[in-house]
Amino acid sequence: MGARNSVLRGKKADELEKIRLRPGGKKKYRLKHIVWAANELDRFGLAESLLESKEGCQKILTVLDPLVPTGSENLKSLFNTVCVIWCIHAEEKAKDTEEAKQKVQRHLVAETKTTEKMPSTSRPTAPPSGNGGNFPVQQVAGNYTHVPLSPRTLNAWVKLVEEKKFGAEVVPGFQALSEGCTPYDINQMLNCVGDHQAAMQIIREIINEEAADWDAQHPIPGPLPAGQLREPRGSDIAGTTSTVEEQIQWMFRPQNPVPVGSIYRRWIQIGLQKCVRMYNPTNILDIKQGPKEPFQSYVDRFYKSLRAEQTDPAVKNWMTQTLLVQNANPDCKLVLKGLGINPTLEEMLTACQGVGGPGQKARLMAEALKEAMAPAPIPFAAAQQRRTIKCWNCGKEGHSARQCRAPRRQGCWKCGKAGHIMAKCPERQAGFLRVGPMGKEAPQFPCGPNPAGADTNSTPDRPSRGPTREVHAAREKAERAEREAIQRSDRGLPAARETRDTMQRDDRGLAAPQFSLWKRPVVTAHVEGQPVEVLLDTGADDSIVAGVELGSNYSPKIVGGIGGFINTKEYKNVEIRVLNKRVRATIMTGDTPINIFGRNILTALGMSLNLPVAKIEPIKIMLKPGKDGPKLRQWPLTKEKIEALKEICEKMEREGQLEEAPPTNPYNTPTFAIKKKDKNKWRMLIDFRELNKVTQDFTEIQLGIPHPAGLAKKKRITVLDVGDAYFSIPLHEDFRQYTAFTLPSINNAEPGKRYIYKVSPQGWKGSPAIFQYTMRQVLEPFRKANPDIILIQYMDDILIASDRTDLEHDRVVLQLKELLNGLGFSTPDEKFQKDPPYQWMGYELWPTKWKLQRIQLPQKEVWTVNDIQKLVGVLNWAAQIYPGIKTRNLCRLIRGKMTLTEEVQWTELAEAELEENKIILSQEQEGCYYQEEKELEATVQKDQDNQWTYKIHQGGKILKVGKYAKVKNTHTNGVRLLAQVVQKIGKEALVIWGRIPKFHLPVERDTWEQWWDNYWQVTWIPDWDFISTPPLVRLVFNLVKDPILGAETFYTDGSCNKQSREGKAGYITDRGRDKVRLLEQTTNQQAELEAFAMAVTDSGPKANIIVDSQYVMGIVAGQPTESESKIVNQIIEEMIKKEAIYVAWVPAHKGIGGNQEVDHLVSQGIRQVLFLEKIEPAQEEHEKYHSNVKELSHKFGLPKLVARQIVNTCTQCQQKGEAIHGQVNAELGTWQMDCTHLEGKIIIVAVHVASGFIEAEVIPQESGRQTALFLLKLASRWPITHLHTDNGANFTSQEVKMVAWWIGIEQSFGVPYNPQSQGVVEAMNHHLKNQISRIREQANTVETIVLMAVHCMNFKRRGGIGDMTPAERLINMVTAEQEIQFLQAKNSKLQNFRVYFREGRDQLWKGPGELLWKGDGAVIVKVGADIKIIPRRKAKIIKDYGGRQEMDSGSNLEGAREDGEVA
């Protein structure tokens, strides 16, 4: 310490302690900074004695100056300290560090006569290589010369490596020492390292790799002129094949300089970083602060690991700002988050000093109380009781024993008794056991001591003085007086009773104001007429409020609480009005975080703390009508199972879940036992299949399991489990008898013991639905009281997530546990998860990510069908986060009808697929949580095996992935499959997130629109973007719509004999060529395909092919990309080779040109030629109205093939394909309405959902008034009971709502792109615009053409339900509805009559029977299960009047009746 003590002495040391560390800061320099600087100098090979003089400090600054821009924080601090010491030695006055640096800078500029400024240490910037004053390459007289490295620099480098042993400090140390060096100098530094040859070898390998990459990227340009400097190779940069002079020339030549020194330094840094990672394998993500570890120690470890990270400065800066705070312990994290955004390291270290001590915790609690005042106040525990102040030391009033000046007396300062101290005084305990009556007979306020009588310090069940009997007698007397007073006020003041009734929250047996603990009990009180918000705190002895002026008649008091001691003013006999009751009590005013009423006022108000026990009401369950319970015999069981079942039943009986069945119970269900997963314990199972058949049906309330990707990102998560979930739900008493079962005995040694369930049993079909319903009812108040909490409940698994503090989050979890425990649900501690990772629903959750729990694929020698099914199930489960999982070939192993135990023979493709899946599963994948404010996106990709994969993400964060490989058709088209994939993703997104994502599809827009022309039903697909990730979905061949001029035309045909299965396929061309092939074991369709394949194979690059097979035309027009048919795949391969191909269809056997010739060629005139009439009138009809296929077929009697060909040959109708009609499940009165736009006009469209009938017209503006007028027109023409629209402003306007109310229309609204929304009218808008485009030239104005198009669509378009036009279908539905209503009305009248009748010669009257129908000559009567036809003359019809029936004695009873009823 000698040298260190001699650095600054006497006045110089005093001057040091006057200089501030920061401008305007409080901290100043101390001698410890000098000691630290002396230690740091040794690291740089500098003697600490240099600090003793001005010249020595100047030498230090000269060495440190070039290292500051790229140096560490320690280096900058050392530089700053030396600047301050220099100023003291030079007798330069400096107030702080910055001023000292400025003075040093001016001095250095004056001495070196240069304008260069000292680098700033606050924001390091890397200087360009070669710009400095102390570098090995220096400019002398305009020439660059090389100065070898000094021994001090080499010694500092060797010492750094030896001390740190390739720690994280080696990389920045090398950067600083090698700044401006040539490769020669860097090799000299590496050669100085004697040990650590393994690390040196790693560096050499990195150098070789980088040199090879350099050579590959910079090829030799060719021979150079004599005397010209060559370009450096990789070995030149490494210094092995180049001289120092060449290196300097490359670095500093005027044109195209190559900084070989900087490049070589970067290579070495890569190698050093690799060595650091090898010598220090700790990941920075694993650097976390221990519970009791000082924050400074944690920061040291963090930065040491940070230096070893191989990443750019931006990422390191992010790690510093994020991970340093995130991985701190909870105490430090709470402090750091209070510092705001991006605090400095010094601020962090200062704030976290002493974290964890009692003082810091008290400060945190006080601050938390103050922060919580605005949103929701939290209780503040007041100090010790000081109501009736009497000194137990001297016996005088007016002061306490603490303030007494008399000599101390032994004993308790609270009660004055000996044997204990005040902290353990029994009088300080608060008892809240209720003595008074509970229920509806209770008074307005719960019973308690009389505020004017009993001492408010005493508790209801523990007297402070006097015998217990006297206290209880006084309490009962006060209670009787209070009840009588309230009863008198009720009799005299009805308003008082009404006011009290309104204050009661619900009827749970306590007729008094009740405060739910779902939130803090805060009420408004008036203190001497001044309103204040106060917290009712049963844990506080005194009452303290702030902001109230009560005058000067007070006594000063000091009370203690969580936040420390508070100076207060105590006022006695203050009038307080709260909850419509007035009392006088003692209250204090002071600087309290929250206003509280303690027990002194609560007791005076007559309040008490009660715990009402809630009860789950059982739900009434019945058997199906006419069914009885199960009566099955118990099958034999092994002795081991019987003993296990006996033990289980005895335990369940003790816990109240079972009870013995009475001997009168006739029902029984077999029971048995199986081993649990651990193979040590048994599980009781009961075969409730028979009981499930006869039990009434239930509805599953929760249809699916929640997905972690749908959870919002929260800071804190807790997972808990409801133990014995079903066994916590009581079973209705009337149903318990049906759950009876019997425990048999060995050898029938004794009668079996019979039990019935008192709770919902496992295996019974009603347990899940009842449990779900009950849990929803239980948790509903909790959800409403905590809207910021995410509560996910699926069966017995509960997840709670929030952004609250640890304390608040744990408090909410504790409230939930207490709620469940209070209702009889257990929450076992072994399944309570407070710290990540959380095991939940098969997932592994973390606060910022989620994963699947570990997936282990089975390893088997012999695989059965059941094993493959389980394997595929596991892989499908993994596919939600592991992209690339495939199961197609595995599923093919178990195609067909196979038993579960049948052995499976593996194929090579299936084995390869399984191995590929194993590789995918070996790489762990993570998912992220949903952020509602960000856009939801879905990216779809297609692999080479026609399997589709997709990921749903928000930016770069993946929420989940999935796959799709369903191929429903033999011949598939990639675009059609893509539409199916989008539909699946859309449905999945609606279920999980309730919104449709934006799609990124691997298809070109032209390809999509070309296919969409024929399959326009996919127009509901929302916004999508094209992505160029191969393989793209393409239409593989160019199918043109018009005949190709100059190309050869092929007419194809095929035929087959159904008996012999022999056939022919062939073609004939317009150029005289023909070809026929004999086929065996074929079909007509196969023969047609063979003929088409022959034509495609034998044709040139362009061809016209005419077919008469609708089957072939349908396959080719669909443009399949692959097929399971060998012939179709051959056709696809051949058509890909064609430049263009035109395919058309003509009706078979119509005598059409080459088609007739090829028909004779392949069938030799066997077929009969039919000529169809009325083709021309049908074509004229279509050209005028553009009718659809079914309308032409119906009106002109044409086959559908011919009618479809007429439509297909129409250029306008060919723009969009024929609609694929489906059945819409809709009521008669349901309409959908929407507005669309055309040519700048607004068209309002209404569609009858069930029939497709359309009403449309042009409106001047899209307003509520115009929409309401159109709705009135619509309602005046057609029956309408339900109108469905989107949520546009015109449809949600008051005018439309008023019209809907006046007419009696139920109005509902949908959302865009929802398949269950306004899809019918959206599609009809599309139809209407297409129809208008076909006939647009027939009218001038939009108003006219809209009405003409509506006429065509309603009367000229046939198809759908009933093969009718929309107008016919709507009228048919209206008339059918009227007829049904008439018949139902008539049948309901007939049901009011009974028939007595005679049969044959039997003179006895029989009956009564139920009248089904009454005709002119006979009636139809139902008697029991028989239906009889009785002549009118043998039947007597009477009306059923309930309890009185009159016989019809004459035919006049069937005519006019007094009540007007006629049978």
Swiss-Prot record:
Site positions for Essential for RT p66/p51 heterodimerization, renumbered to this chain? Answer: 1011, 1024
Residue numbers spanned by region Interaction with human PPIA/CYPA and NUP153: 191-228
Cofactors named for this entry: Mg(2+)
One Pfam annotation, family name? IN_DBD_C
Basic and acidic residues bias located where?
462-508
* Integrase catalytic domain location: 1223-1374
Report motif location: Tryptophan repeat motif: 1008-1024
- Region labeled Disordered — which residues? 112-138, 441-508
Q: Which PROSITE patterns match?
A: ASP_PROT_RETROV (PS50175), ASP_PROTEASE (PS00141), INTEGRASE (PS50994), INTEGRASE_DBD (PS51027), RNASE_H_1 (PS50879), RT_POL (PS50878), ZF_CCHC (PS50158), ZF_INTEGRASE (PS50876)
Q: Mind telling me which residues the site (Cleavage) is annotated on?
A: 135-136, 365-366, 382-383, 431-432, 445-446, 512-513, 611-612, 1050-1051, 1170-1171
Motif Nuclear localization signal: positions: 26-32
Region (Dimerization/Multimerization of capsid protein p24) residue spans: 279-365
Q: Which residues bear the site annotation Cis/trans isomerization of proline peptide bond?
A: 222-223
UniProt-listed Gene3D superfamilies: 1.10.10.200, 1.10.1200.30, 3.30.70.270, Acid Proteases, HIV Type 1 Reverse Transcriptase, subunit A, domain 1, Human Immunodeficiency Virus Type 1 Capsid Protein, Immunodeficiency lentiviruses, gag gene matrix protein p17, Integrase, C-terminal domain superfamily, retroviral
Reactions that this protein is recorded to catalyse: Endopeptidase for which the P1 residue is preferably hydrophobic; Endohydrolysis of RNA in RNA/DNA hybrids. Three different cleavage modes: 1. sequence-specific internal cleavage of RNA. Human immunodeficiency virus type 1 and Moloney murine leukemia virus enzymes prefer to cleave the RNA strand one nucleotide away from the RNA-DNA junction. 2. RNA 5'-end directed cleavage 13-19 nucleotides from the RNA end. 3. DNA 3'-end directed cleavage 15-20 nucleotides away from the primer terminus; 3'-end directed exonucleolytic cleavage of viral RNA-DNA hybrid; DNA(n) + a 2'-deoxyribonucleoside 5'-triphosphate = DNA(n+1) + diphosphate
Residue ranges of domain RNase H type-1 in the record: 1044-1167
Which residue intervals are the DNA-binding region?
A: 1393-1440
Which residues does the Swiss-Prot or TrEMBL record annotate as the active site? 537
Q: Which CDD domains does the entry link to?
A: HIV_retropepsin_like
Q: How is its activity regulated?
A: Protease: The viral protease is inhibited by many synthetic protease inhibitors (PIs), such as amprenavir, atazanavir, indinavir, loprinavir, nelfinavir, ritonavir and saquinavir. Use of protease inhibitors in tritherapy regimens permit more ambitious therapeutic strategies. Reverse transcriptase/ribonuclease H: RT can be inhibited either by nucleoside RT inhibitors (NRTIs) or by non nucleoside RT inhibitors (NNRTIs).
**Any idea what this protein is called?**
Gag-Pol polyprotein
**Source taxonomy:** Viruses, Riboviria, Pararnavirae, Artverviricota, Revtraviricetes
